[in-house]
Each structure stands twice: as C-alpha cells, then as structure tokens.
Amino acid sequence: EFQMPFGFKEVEGIHSRTNFDLSQHEKYSGKNIKYFDPELGESYVPYVIETSIGVDRMFLSVLCSSYEDQQLEGGERRVVLHLPAALAPVKVAVMPLVRKDGLPEKAREILDGLRLHFNTQIDEKDSIGKRYRRQDAIGTPYCVTVDHQTLEDNTVTLRHRDTMEQHRVPIAEILPTVSKEVSMASLLQKIAE
C-alpha cells in the first residue's frame, strides 16, 4: 500500500494461494501435477504465490510523492514536481533571457547540441521567473539560461529544479553535467545508497 493524498491505496497485491489452485486443477483434470523433490525424496503439489502490480498505480504513487506546493517568501507559491531526474519526461529546458539580440539563436544552437542525447525543449514565452516556475511544475530537472554574457564567453546559467541553485558553466559542460544526473545508472546508484 501507498499513502496517496486521498488515503492508503494498494499498489501491489501479493496473494499466497498455497496449493489450493493446483490441487483443484489436479482433482478436476485427473492429471498428476505433483512435483517430485529429489532432495526430500517426496512428491507434493507446489504452493503458488501470485502477485499483481498495476503500472498506473505505481506511476500515480510516484507522481503523488513527487508533487509539492511550496509557499515562498513574499507570499508566492511554487508548484514543483520532484520527479527523479531519470524519470522526468523533459530533462532540460533552454531559455533565452530575452527574445532578441541573438539570444534565441544561441539558445537553439545549444538545444540542437543536447536534443540528440535526451528530451530537451526551448521556452521563450513570459519572464524568466515564470518560465522557471512552469518547468518546475512539469518536473524538468535543469534549466539553461542563455543571456548576453553567453555571447561573450560561451557560458550559461544552469539552474537545478529542486534547489533552485544557479551556476555559470561553460556550454561544453552542460551535456556531461546533465547526462550524469539524469541517467538511469545515477538513479539506481542513489537507490542503492
């Protein structure tokens, strides 16, 4: 069971059927379906353990545990979908600070370099703050902001969804940095720790 916002719900059912089902099948079919265990030197009808798991319920439990409606300073609200980065549908959003001065073109150039490696989108509409909020709400783990400094020194601002921390990184470091964080291997390693 999993604690959903609307109460505990079953995600997986595990049922110990003992040997009832196979015994009934043996009884009505007239076939011997006993298993001979050479170690014990005896025959018996095996026990059956039946499991059933719904992908839809499992996915719903991930969504419910990832959703957060934060109250920020100044009364603002921030909806964040803290999906594990490996499960996020969009890994990176590339955002030109403004829609002029060559920034959209540079953003598309960066997008083209990333899109072969993982699902990436460009977001140009509204203020940069609204774009960050929009990407937070859909679970995008990283945002890349292209600004006027990008045109001067080939660096961008890389923003992390969960911490909202921002760092200047060279364009060449976006792919290795993000790839490491959004890989399934990274997720499995975090689970194992």
Protein language model regions, located:
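NTP/phosphate- and nucleic-acid-binding module
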Residues: E1-E193
